[in-house]
Amino acid sequence: VIKFACNRCPEKLVKVSDMCQGCLAHPCQEVCPKKAISFRNGRSHIDQDLCIKCGRCVTTCPYNAIVKVERPCAKACGVGAIRSDEHGRADIDYNKCVSCGMCLVNCPFGAIVDKGQIFQLIQSIKRGDEVIAIVAPAFVNQFPNMTPAKLREAMKRLGFANTAEVAIGADLCTIDEAHDFLEEVPSKHPFMGTSCCPAWSVMAKKNFPKFADCISMAMTPMVLTARLLKQDHPAARICFVGPCAAKKLEASRHSVRSEVDFVLTFEELMGMFEAKQINFDDLPDDPNDNFNNASADGRGFAVSGGGGAAGG
């Protein structure tokens, strides 16, 4: 959290707006379990000391005159990791945080950021390092009308030596997880959860520790793709590009650092395209396109339920 940029939004507040009509039925007052609503000068008034923010008055008001205001970052956080510091600014409890990035994309003031590696990546390219981009299959939803061949050409113009799709790693991950499943379920564990999403696996292990052993030990598609490429390019530096900030957490792990050197989000990649004034409409297809080496199920990892469908 960038403290000086935080707007100190109210954590949770139920408030009567100017739309209150002062109706005679007083439904908001009738449904309040704490008798926190009174009427002053013909308008509804909420005693914040008594209000428990249950929202019953919000849903009952026929004029939608009562609103429930919540801090956007805290509302988006699914694990309750956002709290307030002594000055009322947002603060992250890293014992609960799973680095999913939901607070980051929901803060209207841009006060929550993740650690970027654009500078380090550009310096590596300028030094002449062989930098290979491995791109998540979700790129088709991030860049309209972008074909794999056009993406390879665009990445080449940024200075990348080559570009591969992480879907091939998803295929390898499916094989490993299927092997784990056949070996361990139900003989050792009642079920098995996928390991492909670091935010999910961290959340499961933090909040459901008794089921931690039920998470597959298979490497993620990102790591498996990086390992595959380094077999033929041992000196190459690997840059993962995807939609999720949680991959930055994964890449910081000691066991992954030797495999993946940089992580960019699609937003950061788009910033690089704009800085280099790369127009997708004007791009020719890369004639050496060998991007499509994965299965349809591997690309389906980017769809909700895709991992399970690939393993089924």
Stretch-by-stretch model annotation:
Residues 1, 114-312:
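Iron-sulfur-associated redox domains of electron-transfer enzymes in respiratory
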Residues 1-60, 64-76:
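Ferredoxin-type iron-sulfur electron-transfer modules and their immediate structural context
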Residues 11-15, 95-97, 233-241:
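Immediate flanking context of iron-sulfur cluster ligation sites
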Residues 22, 26-31, 60, 106, ...:
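Transmembrane alpha-helical segments of multi-pass membrane transport proteins and ion-pumping complexes
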Residues 30, 75, 105, 153-157, ...:
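Surface-exposed charge patches
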Residues 32, 41-43, 65, 70, ...:
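Glycine-rich, histidine-containing beta strand-loop boundary motifs that form or position
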Residues 47-48, 53, 63, 72-132, ...:
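Conserved Radical SAM active-site core
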